[in-house]
Amino acid sequence: MGIRELITFRISGRGVWGYEFYDEARQKIGSVSSSVSPSLPVRIESQNIHWYSRFEMDTTIIPGIGRRVHDNQTGNEVFRLIYWRPGLYQVRSNSQPVQVEVKEGRYLFGQQGMPATALSERIPDIGWQPASSFEYEAYFKTTFYEKVNEVFALMVLSFPALRFY
């Protein structure tokens, strides 16, 4: 099997586009990332992408304020960012609940008191069709991790997953 193009589109938002490579046993075998801007078309090519993909963006924390991200070529809403508010959140169905609270004016979550960033809300019907041989998995995976020597956490939001068949 040769190299095949998975998807090409323009994204509204600035940040780092990243995607990870997995083998058939879902073992990670590599990853690539690059800076993106609203004017930059994002093109992903590989013969061994099993799960797809990840978008990373530093953001100012404004709890309760949402941001919508659109595919600039089609106008479809790709995902919506919803910033944390105090309360209990289930980030994924199999995850531990995350308590978000306010301390000294800052929104914090988790046992380490990490600053709260954002959670993603799946846009269920964006009218986007994956390339042939790929199946659209209608969910998002949200991951959080802390940047080294930085005040705020880095928000990591995945795009809709594609499973290779």
How would you describe each model-predicted region?
Residues L40-D71:
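Short, well-structured hydrophobic secondary-structure segments
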Residues M1-P41, Q47-N48, Y52, N76-E77, ...:
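Low-complexity or membrane-interfacial segments used for flexible interactions
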